[in-house]
């Protein structure tokens, strides 16, 4: 048998040309130690800060500490079955979460994975969890109102689209209720809402979701949950995942509202992670970058300029204080980052004034520009009236005889306090708020007993809707009160008082 040399060489050449060297090179490391949701890994020399890794058991991790001989990795999962010597491989990518319309109405974890047993989330787009906040030129000043449906807030501490307004108070003062009311109030306003629960009991989150479903609010709401039983790393990531989902709507010329409930637990989760990673502790054992932790999160809420679509992302962070101490580390940090705060007080809550908003300590630094003219007109003197009432109230504890003017002021104040009370989960439309506050500040309630203010409120809305529907319509369309409308309104209120009270 003869071999032809040129035949053999052509076959070899063909084999060489068609040879497919498909080698996948993976960089792996070994676990040195693992404890409390943090793994110390040796061998991942080229890893980036914030890079994702995969453990032997399929859990994902994120590199946070890059040291000379090892890498500190937080485990984004239960970490079951991980032991010393187990291998860890680099994924060469940063953490991304799903964004888009597919998430609306769903309950997801901090990685965007569904936890509501309603099947997979079919998202078309994924975005990086850590994004840089928009610069100055991309923004526009806050000028559109975001109505919360809560009388005391819309009149005295107005919130605008793109604002960051802190809700602060002790435990059990109604902070979550204010936030949930605001979400319910966005029905039909074209605002997508995101509720981020950080370190909450699962029963509490289930209750919030149930409330939102009852009021039809889950149709435009995404719930991101990192519960108390979840690893600290997931509690740390949850707000960033939530704001990434919100930014998608803002960047697509829509309006979004995000609630962080609450950032005190977020800071505690970050402190826990940092201490296990052996980062040096600072004040109250928080790490040195705890201010940056919250500032980089809250700066991502913004109102975009017209060239970028004029979308907005409004943030309502919640902070829980201990015994009303607003001067603690985390509260002062977040107060200085946000555009104002709504301060809720235990004493007011216990005395039946709910929502328990302390009008003196609550401010909105940029919301005034967003408030509609009608609300501004009727609530102009309201803050001053309430402040004078509080002062007089303290004074009357020592002095019994009051002059006529002081007595009138005291009585007006009592009625205004009663007027601003509101049951939970019953947000009011702007036109109804304007009518009610107009009645209070213009003295129409001065001759009605304090105990009958609620009766007046319950009756005036259906009365105007039935007999004078044009009043509500004009307030809605004009967004201001002219002399004709004021006259009509005064006439309607007097007519109602004469016939029904």
Swiss-Prot record:
Membrane topology listed for this record? Peripheral membrane protein
* Keywords, alphabetical: ATP synthesis, ATP-binding, Cell inner membrane, Cell membrane, CF(1), Hydrogen ion transport, Ion transport, Membrane, Nucleotide-binding, Translocase, Transport
The top EC class, named as a word, is translocase
**Subcellular location(s) per record:** Cell inner membrane
User: GO CC annotations?
Assistant: plasma membrane; proton-transporting ATP synthase complex
Does Transport appear among the keywords? Answer: yes
Q: What is this protein's record name?
A: ATP synthase subunit alpha
